[in-house]
Design a protein with these regions (language model features):
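Loop-centered beta-sheet repeat module
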Residues: 168-217
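Sequence/structural signature of outer-membrane beta-barrel proteins
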Residues: 27-34, 66-70, 100, 156-160, ...
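Outer membrane beta-barrel
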Residues: 9-159, 186-191, 195-203
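Outer-membrane beta-barrel transmembrane domain signature
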Residues: 111-112, 121, 158-183
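Active-site glycine- and acidic-residue-rich loops that bind
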Residues: 127, 181-189, 222-231
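Detector for outer-membrane/organellar transmembrane beta-barrel domains
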Residues: 15, 196-260
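Short coil-to-helix leader/linker segments, especially the first N-terminal amphipathic alpha-helix
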Residues: 1-9
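A short secondary-structure junction signal
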Residues: 147-149, 160-166, 217-218
Length: 260
């Protein structure tokens, strides 16, 4: 299932309850736009290191450190702890991946055969999106189905959605390093996903994300209206014999000042 994706990774070396792994993703590209090309280009897009440890019978820790485009961007993409009450109720806290669609959770390069990431996951859903927070997730298995749920409160996206160098609305610009230290408005964002899977058919999931993105008060004084960003997504994986078909659709709504 999509939910368990962060634990289904290429771990290469294990010792006791701890495992270390990772992957590197390099591309050679030749692009042409309107008959014009800049020739051949090569890049080391990502170099990722994973660390996992089962601390005890109920506690699991996992993390991911990513080097993107060489050392242009270095990010701690995941660093979370799971406390397993039972498989149907797991408490999670740390730097986590909000479950908006399937790709934001299962985005590792070795899983896919394509060079570029899906447009819906970069132009609408700002994958890869990591946020600090906590919540619960779990899995149930009634009558041959596997049902899963995730629900988290996180710091959320920031004012870069509207105030950015692109001069337009851009959800990816709402990501900033400051969001790992504090929430810019003190109102956590809510993200949630529910999904159903049948082993011989596939999986379908429905996701929701909503949070206030602007700083609407200063020193306790309200200085602006609250403005929120909302995302809805549906993801589908259909297994037809040896073929697996995957798709994802998303819609975003952003509240902006009346002057815009």
């Amino acid at each position: 299932m999509v939910q368990g994706g962060i634990y289904q990774r290429p771990f290469l070396v294990s010792a006791g309850r701890t495992a270390v792994g990772g992957y590197a993703e390099g591309h050679a590209e030749y692009a042409k736009t309107d008959g014009v090309t800049e020739g051949l280009s090569m890049a080391l897009r990502r170099f990722n290191i994973f660390l996992f440890s089962s601390v005890g019978r109920r506690i699991r820790f996992t993390s991911e450190l990513e080097f993107e485009n060489g050392t242009e961007e270095i990010a701690l993409e995941t660093a979370l702890v799971d406390f397993v009450v039972n498989p149907s109720f797991v408490i999670r806290a740390g730097i986590l991946l909000p479950p908006i669609g399937a790709f934001n959770v299962n985005h590792d390069g070795p899983r896919y055969d394509f060079v570029e990431r899906p447009l819906v996951s970069t132009q609408i859903i700002p994958a890869t999106l990591s946020e600090v927070g906590g919540g619960v997730h779990g899995r149930l298995a009634p009558r041959g189905l596997s049902l899963s749920y995730d629900a988290y409160l996180t710091n959320g996206l920031g004012e870069g959605i509207l105030l950015n160098s692109l001069g337009r609305l851009d959800l990816a610009s709402g990501k900033s390093e400051e969001r790992f230290a504090e929430d810019n408005n003190g109102e956590p964002a809510l993200s949630a996903r529910v999904a159903a899977q049948r082993r011989d058919l596939g999986e379908i999931g429905f996701s929701f994300y909503r949070g206030t993105y602007n700083s609407f008060r200063t020193d306790g004084v309200v200085v602006d209206d609250k403005r929120a960003v909302s995302l809805l997504a549906v993801d589908l994986r259909a297994d037809v014999g040896p073929v697996s078909l995957q798709g994802e659709a998303a819609a975003a709504a952003v509240e902006v000042p009346e002057s815009l």
